């Protein structure tokens, strides 16, 4: 298949109804991602520097490999930033299991994506709470934890969270496995009162590992 290279400038990309997920209008942030319609960086490709709510609008039926050249991104299983989430940090992803292999679920679709504007690995802080609405035991975290329970958290669930700065990815299971939840200080005012606010795919309050997202 003939390779087609298409470069899009920030102002030429489609706007999204979720305005808070985009960089400030007129700014060009440190974000760049290249997607391919075939595995191993083959086939048609396209570069983005801002959000894409639907790759099919760019004549892609799916994203089968990608390269993150600048910044941190989050990919979604479905269009309009819905479904399972996949954190995409700088590097190469030759096929779907490179971004969802640790997810423990077989998901080959990636239909939308956006930059994580608040990612700041050096200055990140989150407070987790035992119950919903910031009630119960609380724990302030500024580092990565492959197992919350091993570090003293009393159970395998988190009721609510406050993101003071940075962006975090929380995982359903220890060792950064299971469903991924991307939580950012510039979404919901940094306050996630209930596990249903973690994402459209959230089905449980189970969180057992957590780490900072690297910009």
Swiss-Prot record:
List residues, modification S-methylcysteine.
82, 117
Q: Where is this region: Connecting peptide?
A: 118-123
Chain segments carrying region Disordered: 1-24
Please report the PTM annotation for this entry: Specific cleavages in the N-terminal arm occur during lens maturation and give rise to several truncated forms. Isoform A1 contains a N-acetylalanine at position 2.
Q: Does the keyword Acetylation apply?
A: yes
Check the record and name the PROSITE patterns matching this protein: CRYSTALLIN_BETA_GAMMA (PS50915)
Family stated for the protein in its record = Belongs to the beta/gamma-crystallin family.
User: Protein name, please?
Assistant: Beta-crystallin A3
Q: Report the gene name.
A: CRYBA1
């Amino acid at each position: 298949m003939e390779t087609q290279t298409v470069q899009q400038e920030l102002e030429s990309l489609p706007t999204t109804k979720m305005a808070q997920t985009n960089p400030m209008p007129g700014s060009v942030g440190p974000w760049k991602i290249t997607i391919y319609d075939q595995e191993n960086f083959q086939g048609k490709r396209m570069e983005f520097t801002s959000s894409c709510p639907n790759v099919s609008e760019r004549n892609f039926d799916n994203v089968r490999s990608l390269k993150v050249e600048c910044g941190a991104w989050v990919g979604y299983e479905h269009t309009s930033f819905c479904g399972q989430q996949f954190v995409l940090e700088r590097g190469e992803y030759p096929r779907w299991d490179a971004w969802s292999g640790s997810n423990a679920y077989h998901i080959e679709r990636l239909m939308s994506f956006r930059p994580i504007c608040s990612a700041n690995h050096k200055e990140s802080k989150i407070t987790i709470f035992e119950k919903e609405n910031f009630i119960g035991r609380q724990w302030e975290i500024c580092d990565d934890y492959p197992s919350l329970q091993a570090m003293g958290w009393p159970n395998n669930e988190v009721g609510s969270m406050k993101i003071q700065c940075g962006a975090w990815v929380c995982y359903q299971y220890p060792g950064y496995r299971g469903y991924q939840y991307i939580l950012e200080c510039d979404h919901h005012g940094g306050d996630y009162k209930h596990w249903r606010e973690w994402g459209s795919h959230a089905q449980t309050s189970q969180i057992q590992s957590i780490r900072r997202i690297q910009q």
